[in-house]
Structure formats: structure tokens, C-alpha cells
């Protein structure tokens, strides 16, 4: 019999869910099944090239003034794509035009603490907890009068999309999530992992210290580039590609949001009381009922779960795909064709 906690999760699954995906290094991959196809190979090199987005737009949404870009027709089916850390909207520089050319209205916002997104009030706490970022997405969709959308994301973005799919399924027509089910909670974040798994979270523990906070502030670009290299060890990106994104880390709230996010996961920083009810619901690891495709790169160097460990968290139509060819953590930018295809396929579910 498997040991279960108060929220109904097995102890093994609770261990795996540290923060957003801790402990995955210790979980062996399951054999591929018809629900777990291998796709690819794909390219693993990226140059910035001449491609760019249209002008960055700004809109007041909830507690933020959000910077975002769009592609495709204004009357197309809405697709909202969400980046992670330490990345930005340019993770979708190839995905957005691919989907736009197929008639989708693609919207890519900067998350709080990135790019041109700003807080409307200096008094608002610079809070990086998961439910705050999810509430940002709901407010952003409200501001753009998007009733529901296909949501896609990786890293922080996948977690945010998954939370909206779980708590507000009427706002999410379908979901594409890199690395699967990433909803976490502070209780899971307090559970110690075996040393090999803890080692993969070195930066989380570094951020728990004043030295880590100051070090990240001083060496934002160097830190981000190291994470890119570790998380995507086979991705060959040029300096222009990195610098294009690194400009987003100059946001005046970036460091506070990032540090609070990781400290909150470990229970070392408090959240805001306004999010307590949402966090209570998320702590129960709610199932995601909307149609979903999860993706994983075959060379993801960041902590991530084995697909077999989270398949039962998706109770609607579901498929997992492993993308071959040396694809790492930043899957939309490393494998844009496969990511865009997943969006189009899940739309038909």
C-alpha cells in the first residue's frame, strides 16, 4: 500500500512535486505507450536572425500594466502563450507566427517582473507566488475580453496555465503544458528529497540567502545564461538570441519577484492573504479536466517529472509527447514546430 498524505497524494508524488517538479531525476522513465509518442527529430540551434514581433502593446489588467505582443487575426481563436524563468516572450518568436498563419489570434504577455510589465501601485507587494501569477492571467484575459483561450506554456508559464485550467476551466479551452502537471504547494516544498534531487535545485537554496538575492541582482545575465546552458545542454543559441531575452531582466521588479517565488515555495516567504483560498484549493492538487497535451524534451536538464507520474492528473482527453533531437527546457523556442503542432492538435480534441 502506498503511503498517502492528507491531500490524497502518495508520498512519492508529494516528493516529486517539490516547488514545481522536484525529484524527477530519481524517477525512471516509463516505456512509451500510444499515449506517449515520440516526435522529432527537431533542430537544436537558434540564431536571433531578422525575425521579430510587432510592436509591444500595454494594457491595464488587475494590479498590473501588462506588456504583450500579438500575432494573427484579431478575430481568430485565442491562444495565450506564457513564458518561464529565466526566459521571456521571445521563447515564442517562431511559434507565434506559425499559429498566426493558421488563423489563430496569438497573445504573448510578459509575466510580472519581466519586460515592460509594471505594477500599477508602488504599494502592491512584489509577490511571485503561483496563485498571484495565475490571477494576473485571468485579469489579462478579462482586459482583452478573451472569454476563453487555448493556453500554452513552459516552466512558470506551464504552471500558470495549469492553475487556470484547474481552477477556472471555463477560461481554458485546452492546454499545452511542457513538463506536465506543475501545480505545487508549500507543504510539498517542505519535504526533503534525496541528495541527487536536492542538488538539481541548487539555485533555489542559493536564492534563500541574502547573498543569493544580491548575487542574482548583480549577475542577472550571467545567472540566466548558466541556467539556459544547464537546462538545455544541447541547445546551441547565439549571443544575440540570449541578449534579446536578457533585456527583460532589467525590469525593476524582476529580482524581487524571482526571489519571492522561490522562497515562497520553500515556505521561507509569506504569500498574501488574498490568495489563501486559492492556495488551499491548489494544495489539494486538483485534476485538470480540459483537453491537454503535455510535452517533454528528450534533453531537458532542468528538474522535471516522469510523464507517468502525472498522467492521472489529467482527467479529460490527454496525450503526452516526448520531443526528440536534443530538445531541452525551453521547448517552444528549441522546437517551435512541435509546440505549435501540439496547440493545433489539442484544439481539435
Name each model-derived stretch.
Residues 71-116:
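Conserved HGGG/HGGXW glycine-rich cap/lid loop of the alpha/beta-hydrolase fold
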Residues 342-349:
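C-terminal alpha-helix
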Residues 327-335:
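Catalytic histidine-centered segment of alpha/beta-hydrolase-like enzymes
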Residues 84, 155, 333-334:
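Conserved acidic functional residues
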Residues 31-41:
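Signal peptide processing junction and immediate N-terminal pro/mature segment
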